[in-house]
Amino acid sequence: MSFEVLEQLEAKIQTAVDTIALLQMEVEELKEEKQALATEAGELKASRHELEQKTQQMQEEHSAWQDRIRNLLGKMDDVE
């Protein structure tokens, strides 16, 4: 093989090695991003659950207040 062919082969191998290294770094970045997104998703799920509980509690309190108001209005009607 001629020296030029060996140089071309070396250049191609170096390009392939560089490409592999870049792809490995990109894979690591994507893994980190995936982990961050999974953590964020878990936090959002917990927040949603908490908000659903608060909503349920507020609906129950609202219903209780409506019942109290109805009872008071009923008593006022009885007084008249």
UniProtKB/Swiss-Prot annotation:
Gene3D superfamilies: 1.20.5.340. GO terms for biological process: division septum assembly; FtsZ-dependent cytokinesis. InterPro entries: Cell_div_ZapB. One of its GO terms (cellular component) is cytoplasm. Its main location: cytoplasm. It is found in: Cytoplasm. Keywords: Cell cycle, Cell division, Coiled coil, Cytoplasm, Septation. It holds the Pfam family ZapB. Residues 3-80 form a coiled coil. It comes from the Bacteria. Belongs to the ZapB family. Non-essential, abundant cell division factor that is required for proper Z-ring formation. It is recruited early to the divisome by direct interaction with FtsZ, stimulating Z-ring assembly and thereby promoting cell division earlier in the cell cycle. Its recruitment to the Z-ring requires functional FtsA or ZipA. Homodimer. The ends of the coiled-coil dimer bind to each other, forming polymers. Interacts with FtsZ. This is Cell division protein ZapB. It comes from Vibrio atlanticus (strain LGP32). The lineage of its organism: Bacteria, Pseudomonadati, Pseudomonadota, Gammaproteobacteria, Vibrionales. The gene is zapB.
